[in-house]
Amino acid sequence: MNDQSITVRGKDRYKSGVMEYKKMGYWEPSYQPNDTDVIALFRVTPQDGVDPVEACAAVAGESSTATWTVVWTDRLTAAEKYRAKCYRVEPVPGSPGSYFAYIAYDLDLFEPGSIANLTASIIGNVFGFKPLKALRLEDMRLPVAYVKTFQGPATGIVVERERLDKFGRPLLGATVKPKLGLSGRNYGRVVYEALKGGLDFTKDDENINSQPFMHWRERFLYCMEAVNKAQAATGEIKGTYLNVTAATMEDMYERAEFAKELGSNIIMIDLVIGYTAIQSMAKWSRKNDMILHLHRAGHSTYTRQRAHGVSFRVIAKWMRLAGVDHIHAGTVVGKLEGDPNTTRGYYDICREDFNPMRLEHGVFFDQHWASLNKLMPVASGGIHAGQMHQLLDLLGEDVVLQFGGGTIGHPRGIAAGATANRVALEAMILARNEGRDYVHEGPEILAKAAMTCTPLREALEIWKDVTFNYESTDSPDFVPTVTPAA
């Protein structure tokens, strides 16, 4: 694109009237971002007839200091410093009419340690700007100076494993089904059977809070009774994610405190409670030595569409800053949205100390995490024991594998479903540790384990090779190609 700055300088810059954004200082192709700049990558789709550079400069302006006309009060500020600067515009491969806009923001534009303030600028009014057909925030580079103003995950992967005394394998969980309608007593029964059968965790679903069929306090009491009985029966540390999501912060704190009094080691919140509430609960969780699970309920309303919204990789970065310990991050092989390479990028953001740029995973920037704790990704939605070798290969061992229907839908009952998943996992971990090619030998390994485990045999028979093979709506724009040797 045009690599010449056309910024109007001097007194002409502040003459009353309307001026193109690219002439107001929001397009600076010669700008070299500072180490302390926040950098955002937007996918910009201008309306027909709108100059792409002007559209991208407008995004920079409207997400920082600009308004629709020149204002003389700009002269009362360090305007040159505080203007966001679009310094690079390039076409999106394979998407005619869309452009990547790289925009740098001075660190002083953002309140330290506040996701709400960051998002008010980056995804605020600019997303409704008329000259744009669509706008999507694809990725961000968050400088170390900014990262260090955040708490980060309240517990982190290492300490969570130490508390659970479980190492060297994925953790296993299940969401209680049906998610709505059970009484407290029957809900607790599901929790007990699943934990006794071999799972590490059970979990509330996103929309179970406090309804006429089951008050939250009743659910907490029955669930923790089940956890304690399962721990006594198995000799293992168990947990259940008690959803404390509620109408007000006061209600959420009350529920979290009650969970703590009952001896729970983990609570749960939903993404829909908002960024400030998430950070508040993360702060409470660290203070009270509680693992904090985040269900990403609602994210697909703005992460799933390729042209407009916010990429989940950005949400994952924000949530690592905010301080949650678990986040649902996709399964690749399950029923929910998840391109393999894109999902790997999400998992890397959660679990690495440093994320190098990997365009094939949709990661556009190097990202240093400045010693923030690692975030445990959670895989859930349409997975079952027959996919264990694929899940271990694709997602690694620092992950919670949530088999909801794949546990509770077992023909022999909940405990049998849990046992099937645990035996499948243990068989695959043993094969991996022995150096076997468990990815290609996976079906054979599972079949052999099933010879001495009736629940696993039945699980493999009923679900066989069930998969949800639909084309992903959000896949990387850059695909690695093999270069022939000279």
From Swiss-Prot:
Active site positions, chain numbering: K177 (proton acceptor), H295 (proton acceptor)
Cofactor note (record): Binds 1 Mg(2+) ion per subunit.
Catalyzed chemical reaction(s): 2 (2R)-3-phosphoglycerate + 2 H(+) = D-ribulose 1,5-bisphosphate + CO2 + H2O; D-ribulose 1,5-bisphosphate + O2 = 2-phosphoglycolate + (2R)-3-phosphoglycerate + 2 H(+)
Keyword Phosphoprotein: no
GO biological process, one term: reductive pentose-phosphate cycle
Subunit structure as annotated in this protein's UniProt entry: Heterohexadecamer of 8 large chains and 8 small chains.
Note: The basic functional RuBisCO is composed of a large chain homodimer in a 'head-to-tail' conformation. In form I RuBisCO this homodimer is arranged in a barrel-like tetramer with the small subunits forming a tetrameric 'cap' on each end of the 'barrel'.
Role description: RuBisCO catalyzes two reactions: the carboxylation of D-ribulose 1,5-bisphosphate, the primary event in carbon dioxide fixation, as well as the oxidative fragmentation of the pentose substrate. Both reactions occur simultaneously and in competition at the same active site.
Similarity-based family: Belongs to the RuBisCO large chain family. Type I subfamily.
Name of the protein: Ribulose bisphosphate carboxylase large chain 1
Organism in which the protein naturally occurs: Bradyrhizobium sp. (strain ORS 278)
